[in-house]
């Protein structure tokens, strides 16, 4: 079995380089501790206490990145965060930090770029709507 302090030190180093959610760290700790759930839980709590792991900070960074760089909408972001095990209140708070005006501009530019390819298609409007929904934008926006 791996030594507790070595695993803790390695995970602290990893967390200092990038953001991780609690579920990811728990999986890493379980693997490193060879399935010892109690020790992995203690490691996770210590990392939370020392602010190496913070689900709100992770969710906010994830939402900003996916919104700005990949053009995802709030629905797709919230589903992705829920799949990571982030609770609903944290997801709502993280999505609330996204600037609505910037998100609208990104949505508009993504849809306009797609429209250039669909303009001559008889089902172009339907396909554009479907594309926007698949990107995580709401129907009424």
What role is predicted for each listed range?
Residues 1-141:
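An alpha-helical, amphipathic repeat domain used for nucleic-acid recognition
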